[in-house]
Regions:
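Pyridoxal 5′-phosphate
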Residues: 1-456
Length: 456
């Protein structure tokens, strides 16, 4: 089993008193922490220069907001991330100096806009280590990305009696499009179960694979629990069974290094707004030979090479899948967000966020009445919980009163919450601009509620 991408040889910097024992990876190239999240870690504080979270925070203007008279604490990063000033400025610059439609004019602004748009595509290609820039398709977000694959690839390759595998962890966006396809084609959805920690059961997954399996579509990180899924193994097993594989990277793209060639999936999808970029822009990456075999799922301008009343000849990829005027400015903004993440360093981000997660989970475990939902050893970002005596909405409101933003509800992932016997959770979710002090503010509120917990 490969080591999760957010584990590193280097030790981490933690609050005073925390240290992290580690065990060598079998390959000898990485170190994987052996304690479950929340156990006392060991750290060599000299291993890294300090991660200057205060410098990072100055780059995000919205973090200077006050809510109910208190400094904003943004713990709703699994829903959306905030934007650094450089992204805001880049979008403004586009509208001030480059605004034009792309690809279809000889004038200067069209050339500028096209260069900016295609430059963003190149940035995405490098960020996810795609082999070919033309394999990067811009869409509105992860939801549209999965729908594109389900409608185009699925519509062509799924038939009656075929099977589609998803995991119990999936966001509704990675369930409903496949259900719609299965209903239309007479296919069947199979579900990979999870254990009591929220990690997928690979042995049970292997039992689901057969010659009727056509595609396996799984998240890399659960939006509801934070579980990091062993997607590389899942993809390898799917391919051995002759199936295609899609990985939903909406919740992984901002937390760990993504290498689509290493993962090996046929499709990888994500949203810009989950990686400090704008809303309304996302990515489908697909293997060239798979994309070239797929029909376009929308028709219109930009995706055509020639149109007569008798037939249409389509552009090659990626334009074949980008009908009409795309979200040019926000694609450029996504490119700027990737530049920002690259400057900070995704390894630095992953390391620091893991410190926060270990600390936050440990603190929540000390509060009477708190039940953590999702305790897999391999986690990223998310700390879902319920508090005895309170609805999740009541906890969320109490936190909001103190300026702390968390998501409460089912998080568009009802099946996995019901697996744990709950309908909703409180979901603080972390990003690299959060601090230990902010976690302490959250813990203080939850501890206060627990101290006056209602019974019955």
């Amino acid at each position: 089993q490969s080591t999760p991408a957010f584990y590193f040889v280097d030790a981490v910097r933690l609050p005073s008193g925390y240290t992290t024992p580690a065990k060598a990876d079998p390959l000898g190239t990485r170190v994987q922490r052996v304690e479950p999240l929340g156990a006392t870690p060991q750290a060599d504080h000299s291993a890294h220069p300090p991660f200057d979270v205060n410098a990072i925070r100055r780059d995000f203007p919205i973090l200077r907001e006050r809510v109910n008279g208190k400094p904003l604490v943004w713990f709703d990063n699994a829903a959306t991330t905030h934007k650094p000033q450089s992204v805001i400025d880049r979008i403004s610059y586009f509208y001030e100096h480059e605004n034009s439609n792309i690809h279809r004019a000889a004038h200067e602004l069209a050339a500028r806009a096209t260069d900016a748009y295609e430059g963003a595509r190149e940035r995405v290609k490098k960020f996810i280590n795609a082999p070919d820039v033309n394999e990067v398709i811009f869409v509105r977000g992860t939801t549209e990305a999965i729908n594109l694959v389900a409608k185009s690839w699925g519509g062509q390759h799924i038939g009656a009696g075929d099977e589609i595998i998803v995991s119990n962890l999936e966001h509704h966006a990675n369930i409903v499009p496949w259900q719609q396809l299965a209903a239309a084609k007479g296919a069947k959805i199979r579900v990979i179960p999870v254990d009591d920690s929220g990690q997928v059961l690979l042995d049970e997954y292997k039992k689901l694979l057969n010659d009727r399996t056509k595609i396996v579509s799984v998240t890399q990180v659960s939006n509801a629990l934070g579980t990091v899924v062993p997607v590389k193994q899942i993809v390898e097993l799917a391919h051995r069974a002759g199936a295609k594989a899609l990985v939903d990277g909406a919740q992984s793209i901002s937390h760990m290094r993504v290498d689509v060639q290493d993962i090996g999936a046929d499709f990888f999808v994500f949203s810009g707004h989950k990686v400090f970029g704008p809303t309304g822009i996302g990515v489908v990456w697909g293997k060239r030979e798979v994309l070239e075999d797929m029909p376009p799922w929308q028709g219109g301008g930009n995706m055509i090479a020639d149109v007569t009343f008798e037939k249409t000849v389509y552009q090659p990829i990626p334009n074949k899948f980008e009908a009409g005027t795309g979200n040019i400015a926000d694609a450029v903004g996504l490119g700027a967000a990737i530049d920002y993440v690259n400057r900070v360093g995704i390894e630095n981000i992953a390391r620091y966020e893991h410190e926060l997660l270990v600390y936050g989970m440990a603190q929540l475990r000390t509060i009477p009445g708190v039940r953590l939902i999702g305790t897999a050893d391999d986690k990223a970002s998310v700390m879902s919980f319920v508090l005895a005596g309170y609805t999740t909405e009541e906890v969320g409101q109490a936190l909001n009163d103190e300026g702390i933003a968390v998501r409460t509800g089912h998080h568009c992932a009802q099946p996995i919450l019901r697996r744990f016997g709950v309908e909703t959770t409180v979901r603080p979710s972390l990003a690299f601009y959060n601090t230990f002090e902010e976690i302490d503010r959250l813990i203080a509120v939850v501890r206060r509620l627990a101290s006056v917990r209602r019974v019955g």
